[in-house]
Amino acid sequence: MANINENYLKLKAGYLFPEISKRVKTYSEKNPSAKIIRLGIGDVTLPIVPSVVDAMIAASKEMGTAGGFHGYGPEQGYSFLLKSIANNDYGSLGIKIDESEIFVSDGSKCDCGNIQEIFSTDAKIAVSDPVYPVYVDTNVMAGRTGEIGADGRYSNLIYMPATKENGFQPEIPKEKADIIYLCYPNNPTGTVTTKEALRAWVEYAKKNNSIILYDSAYEAFISEPGVPRSIYEVAGAKEVAIEFRSFSKTAGFTGLRCAYIVIPKELKGRTRGGEEVSINSLWSRRHTTKFNGVSYVTQKGAEACYSPQGKKEIQASIAYYMSNAAKIREGLKKAGYEVFGGVNAPYIWLKTSDNLSSWDFFDRLLDKAQVVGTPGSGFGPAGEGYFRLSAFGKKEDVEEAIARISFL
């Protein structure tokens, strides 16, 4: 009998979203006629835009010809997509990113979870609290976190509380962190950061030889001027930061699977002996060993997102979701809730009513309003007493959900 990786036994009892699904299923079985409105997990509801559909149809037909068939593609991504990403997502910001610094993948969740594999198992990890669970759980699996305490925190993790009192801006740790996870626009709080704050993080990383893992999956939802769209807007960030982007929420690719990670050539790590090593080269070795690449058809669809018509159609979808966010935000405010986010992100973070715990509030919404959201405590101890709602639902469902909640 083979021994197991016992670090998996240190994981919390259940991943957040399966637990939500379990509770909803139990309620549905007992109340089969109930119309449940789901504003929990951040899955999109609008269809893929026409420009992307047309591009994928054309690519599929191309694959059906002798001259246009594509088998295994380049693991890092086809040049046509790499070039579009570099020119549109970074060139438009005045940031120069080379094609060789971009790696196309099947999702930011995978990238955020897999990137830790190239770092030492004794690397000190810092995460905000609340936090996207994948950042923590993958490091638990790798054995970096130690044991979980009664307060829900792992003994070897550095937790950086993001609270109402500090404007949901995690404070730079006083101790040295090797790897720092940052997410802006933030999941779950829906808040954003400033260039000044990012500059301070870059300075900290340089001083401590740290690497920042910057999750920017919701960048396309930024609406206010002056809000940074990339950490590379800060001078020197290429020397200390990796950035994650995704087509999932931006272009509705949750069912198609396409994202990318940017690892600048300037970024270095160290061996135990002090030798500098290219992080780009390390990730390239890992990526090409474990991943065969995103399909040609999907990458042609992703490329179409950058066409003039594709951009127009995608912006319309984003506007639809952000209109939902405004409805949720304003509706909850009128109902007396304290709310955050929902301006530059598709998530609304609210304080639970009557000092209920996050899960008790979940049960109340499900039982009394048949509305499903996400308990804040599922994102970390500092999320206790808070709740996340997603703007990715259908307009009519969002309006009905807010009406139901308002009558509680």
Curated annotation (Swiss-Prot):
The keyword Chaperone does not apply. Pyridoxal 5'-phosphate binds at Y72, S108, K109, Y132, N187, Y218, S246, F247, S248, R257, N292. One of its GO terms (molecular function) is L,L-diaminopimelate aminotransferase activity. Substrate binds at Y15, G42, K109, Y132, N187, N292, R388. Keywords: Aminotransferase, Pyridoxal phosphate, Transferase. Pathway: Amino-acid biosynthesis; L-lysine biosynthesis via DAP pathway; LL-2,6-diaminopimelate from (S)-tetrahydrodipicolinate (aminotransferase route): step 1/1. CDD domains: AAT_like. The keyword Transferase applies. Signal peptide: none annotated. Its cofactor is pyridoxal 5'-phosphate. HAMAP family: DapL_aminotrans_1 (MF_01642). Homodimer. NCBIfam families: DAPAT_plant (TIGR03542). This is LL-diaminopimelate aminotransferase.
